[in-house]
Every structure is written in C-alpha cells, then in structure tokens.
C-alpha cells in the first residue's frame, strides 16, 4: 500500500509498503562464496516477490550508478536507504598468535565488508541486518564484535536466505505500517491516500 504524507500543506514523503531493497555487501577474495550467496539471494527475492506480491530490488556496491560519483558515498547512501542489508563475512585471511603454549587463530573478513556492516549496524535496526558466513567456522575464531551477533551459516546446498529475508521484510512492513498509524492518529497532520 502506498501512503503519501502531507503536513501543513507540505509534501514530505511517501511510505510504500510494497517496494523493498535488499543490499548485498560481498567480498571478492573468495568469489565462489559470494557467487553462491548472490544466487541464493536473487532466488529468494523471486520467491518472495511472487508469494508476498511485493517488488524487491537487489542492489550491491556501485551497481546502476551514473557518472563518476565517489563509490564510498554511493555505497553508504545505498546502505542507509536499504530495507535489508546482507553482509558476507567469509574470512579472507587469518592471524595466528601465541599466548604461552596456546595458539590462537583469528579469521578475518574483508575489511570493506566489515566497514559496511558496521555502518549498517549504526543506521539500520538489527532486524534488517543479516550477517552470513560459511558453515564450519566457530564463533571463537571470528573477531570479538561478530561473536555476539546471530550469524547465518550457508554452504553450497543450504540456502538460508528465503526465511531470513522474509523475516526482515516482515519487520520492515510492520515498521512502515506503524509509522503510518502514528501519522494517521496525529490530528494536526493530514494523510493523503491513493
């Protein structure tokens, strides 16, 4: 449903509960993993569009950008504007340290993905942020800040994206509907319906 909001005779914004954007933050260091995820995400989007009767735009990096804009600014704007943010934190390198006789291994994701994930965690509700990685990685091997989030595992045969994207989109729909309800119940403001 599309709602147009007008306050004091000034058009402010539209609230559209049928169009959504899924942004994929991927790494190119282990391309087969990103390729699996990309295909999983796109397949999930097609299923959800049909099942939920919504439009879902798949987006990533500086895709569909015109001209010579600064890539990092474009990506940050896309992250702020997306409805679901998916970060592929597939480890691309490892650090080994020794503490006495004990060896510790830390697996590190792509720094660009880590930066984009941190920005998304700042801008978006965590219900709209999905952190994915290959199966078989223990939480203790990841950087500290990743260990305290729900991580979604995948492999070549397992596509967790259908359910995860659907849950995040349901959260977006509820949030948008609640926003419209607040605006409608405010007697000083006027809401226009299509």
What does each of the following model-derived ranges do?
Residues 20, 82-83, 124-129, 146-149:
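Short glycine-/polar-rich loops that comprise or flank the Walker A/P-loop
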Residues 142-194:
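C-terminal interaction surface of TIR/SEFIR-family domains
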Residues 62-116, 122:
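TIR-domain catalytic/interaction hotspot
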Residues 5-84:
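Conserved N-terminal substructure of TIR/SEFIR domains
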Residues 125-141:
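Nucleic-acid nuclease catalytic cores
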Residues 29-30, 93, 136-139:
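Conserved nucleotide-binding/hydrolysis micro-motifs of P-loop NTPases
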Residues 50, 119-127:
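Arginine/glycine-rich "motif VI" loop of SF2 helicases in the C-terminal RecA-like domain
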């Amino acid at each position: 449903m599309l709602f147009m909001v007008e306050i004091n005779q000034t058009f402010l914004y539209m609230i559209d509960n049928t169009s959504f954007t899924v942004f994929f933050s991927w790494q190119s260091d282990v391309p087969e993993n990103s390729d699996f995820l990309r295909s999983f995400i796109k397949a999930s989007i097609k299923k959800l569009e049909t099942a939920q009767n919504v439009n879902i735009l798949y987006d990533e990096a500086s895709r569909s950008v015109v001209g010579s804009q600064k890539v990092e600014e474009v990506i940050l704007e896309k992250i702020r504007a997306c409805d679901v943010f998916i970060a592929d934190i597939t480890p691309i390198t490892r650090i080994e340290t020794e503490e006495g006789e004990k060896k510790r291994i830390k697996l590190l994701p792509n720094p660009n993905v880590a930066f984009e994930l941190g920005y998304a965690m700042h801008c978006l509700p965590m219900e709209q942020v999905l952190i994915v990685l290959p199966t078989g990685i223990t939480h203790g091997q990841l950087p500290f800040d990743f260990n305290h989030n729900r991580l979604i595992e995948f492999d070549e045969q397992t596509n967790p994206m259908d359910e995860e994207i659907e849950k995040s989109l349901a959260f977006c729909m509820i949030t948008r509907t609640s926003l419209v309800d607040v605006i409608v119940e405010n007697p000083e403001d006027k809401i226009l319906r299509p």
